[in-house]
Regions:
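Periplasmic plug
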Residues: 1-35
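Outer-membrane beta-barrel translocator/receptor signature
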Residues: 20-23, 32-115, 121-127, 177
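Outer-membrane beta-barrel transmembrane domain signature of Gram-negative proteins
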Residues: 59-79, 248, 257-304
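Transmembrane beta-barrel strands of outer-membrane/channel proteins
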Residues: 64-68, 94-100, 130-136, 195-199, ...
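Repeated loop/turn-to-beta-strand initiation elements of outer-membrane beta-barrel proteins
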Residues: 88-90, 125-130, 190-193, 248
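Acidic/polar loop-and-plug regions of large Gram-negative outer-membrane beta-barrel proteins
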Residues: 99-103, 116-186, 199-231, 275-303
Length: 304
């Protein structure tokens, strides 16, 4: 929620971001709200993160890649880009990626399906971009982070990097789709007007585990939860930038207005403390799952 997509909040994929559809990541230091508006969660203090989608370059791009990663993750990636028209004014860039199998973490399986399409126009004084993407990830027995009991006197050493200490039976399905556009127009050599708008729809479901280290020997307790979530976000930004000089001092001012609407439907259930079971961060993967109780919302349809 705190990551921008080409300067627009609310349209970047939630939770897991696959870099195969992006050209670069920009770390914006300083008061970025003056340029891109305030982050939705209000936590982007002192800077921001901006994802720039892949777009067609002056040189044609045709790339087909296959890969194999430990332990048995295999897949392929197709990247295609062309420019055409007078002075290469128009550009199109497409990316497709598929990956499936066990990751380098023991017994963690991931399936990824990624697709993106970008169109851009660059005229003498006007620039237009349209970006669309779909990001789907299915994770089975994913390794999560751990919490520490506040009264621990020492923090246990980290286990082997490939060891999966998470409870068996956990899974997560995440699906994101977005489309957005941006227009920039140079009114003259000193003034530029811009506008951007986009929308994103996200669906997430899963059964999660929350391991907590309670002993210096690596003993842990496991709680659990199931969460169903659907988000629809609409975002827009418009403004102008002006450059001028006073003597030897050069100035650049930005004035803009941003809008963001997020509709979120959620339902969940958590395991009571009495149903938590124990394990060890160094030991074998725990089997079973704590019983869930006290559901909130409709787990079959969180919109109800």
């Amino acid at each position: 929620d705190e990551v921008m997509l080409d300067g627009l909040y609310g349209t970047a994929p939630r939770q897991l971001i696959d870099m195969s559809m992006y050209e670069r990541v920009e770390v914006v230091k300083g008061a970025s709200a003056f340029i891109n508006g305030m982050s939705p969660g209000g936590s982007g203090i002192g800077g921001g993160i901006n994802l720039i989608p892949k777009r067609a370059t002056d040189d044609p791009i045709t790339s087909v890649t296959t890969f194999y990663e430990m332990n048995s993750q295999t897949g392929g990636h197709v990247d295609f880009g062309r420019r055409f028209g007078k002075d290469n004014q128009f550009g199109i860039r497409a990316n497709l990626k598929y990956a499936d199998g066990e990751t380098a973490i023991d017994d963690e399986d991931r399936n990824s399906q990624i697709g993106s399409l970008s169109f851009d126009y660059r005229g003498d004084d006007t620039r237009i971009t349209v970006d669309a993407g779909h990001n789907e990830k299915n994770i089975d027995h994913g390794r999560t982070s751990v919490n520490l009991l506040g009264t621990l006197t020492n923090i246990p050493d980290a286990p082997d990097a490939s060891h999966n200490y998470n409870a068996d039976g956990t899974w997560a399905d995440l699906e994101d789709s977005f489309v957005q556009g941006r227009v920039e127009h140079d009114v003259n050599d000193y003034l530029m007007a811009y506008a951007a708008a986009g929308t994103r729809h996200m669906e997430e479901s899963g059964i999660y585990s929350t391991p907590r280290i309670t002993g210096t020997d690596g003993t842990m307790t496991y709680g659990g939860s199931t969460i169903i979530r659907e988000d629809t976000t609409n975002s827009a930004l418009t403004g102008a930038r002006v450059k001028f000089e006073t003597g030897v001092v050069k100035h650049e001012l930005n004035a803009g207005v941003s809008y963001l609407q997020n509709k979120s439907h959620q339902a969940w259930a958590f395991s009571p403390s009495a149903s938590a079971f124990t394990g060890n961060i160094y030991g074998p993967t725990p089997t079973g799952y704590p019983a869930l109780a006290a559901p909130s919302g409709n787990l079959s349809d969180p919109g109800l």
